[in-house]
Amino acid sequence: RGVCSTPEGSCVHNGCICQNAPCCHPSGCNWANVCPGYLWDKN
């Protein structure tokens, strides 16, 4: 919930807002509030 997995995992390309959690990032996980390009992980 609120955690985006790495590109190797499951990522949905459509922009995501992650707070206090590693976000999906083209080059891996990144701690940020807004991570454009990916959605929250369904888990």
From Swiss-Prot:
GO molecular function list: ion channel regulator activity; toxin activity
Keyword Secreted assigned: yes
SS bond partners: 4-16, 11-24, 18-29, 23-35
The keyword Ribosomal protein appears for this protein: no
Pro-peptide positions on chain: 1
Subcellular location: Secreted
Modified residues (6'-bromotryptophan): 31, 40
Tissue expression pattern: Expressed by the venom duct.
A GO-annotated cellular component: extracellular region
Keywords, sorted A to Z: Bromination, Disulfide bond, Hydroxylation, Ion channel impairing toxin, Neurotoxin, Secreted, Toxin
Domain of life of the native organism: Eukaryota
Modified residues (4-hydroxyproline): 36
Summary of the function given for this chain in its UniProt record: Mu-conotoxins block voltage-gated sodium channels. This toxin reversibly blocks voltage-gated sodium channel in cephalopods, with no alteration in the voltage dependence of sodium conductance or on the kinetics of inactivation.
Entry domain remark: The cysteine framework is XII (C-C-C-C-CC-C-C).
Name this polypeptide is given: Mu-conotoxin-like Cal 12.2c
Organism listed in the record: Californiconus californicus (California cone)
